[in-house]
Amino acid sequence: QNVTLTLSTGTGVLAGTVTQATNASGVATFADLSINLVGVKNVTATAGALTVVSNAFTITVSGATTINFVQQPSNASAGATIAPAVTVSITDTFGNPISGQNVTLNLSTGTGVLSGTLTQATDGSGIATFADLSINLIGVKNLTAIAGALNVVSNAFTITSATATNISFSGQPSNAVAGATIAPAVTVTLLDGFGNPVSGQ
């Protein structure tokens, strides 16, 4: 007599040989079953008009295999919080979220100091959220997210100068004859609070 198993509670795919014939003792053995998605499951065994539902059992995550930026870092001014918050996901081979996994960010391209809480644990959805990041120096940057042996590089983003807080003569006026051009040219420099030049002001 053939017996067929189906996944009757919970999501995912019940893989393996799901139909087996009973042996001389009336027992059908299913030795290669697997389910790809986590959660509480039941399987139903069917033989002709007969059915029976198994006890509930739980599928848990396998090891972390994939790391991705969900919310990429956005452009920001020097010293300002990068918003919206940067988020990173950790999943297993089947896309199941991995919770409780530490993720660390570092500045992998560009100069400056990446400030904020640089290590966060993933939540129940497999997401690590970095809500207080900032960088002090201007330019094009990339972040790298690291979780164990996994790593991923963010899209490029740009840090621009903050509001000017310092003004100084970088080229003082020189003595000159009345009516003559003062040379060399007089120059004035504007810097923000982090020492970045402020352009277009």
Residue ranges and their predicted role:
Residues 28-31, 128-129:
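Short strand-edge motifs at loop-to-beta-strand transitions and within beta-strands
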Residues 105:
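Major-groove recognition helix of helix-turn-helix-like DNA-binding domains
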Residues 17-25, 116-127:
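Short, acidic Ser/Thr/Gly-rich low-complexity loop/linker segments typical of extracellular
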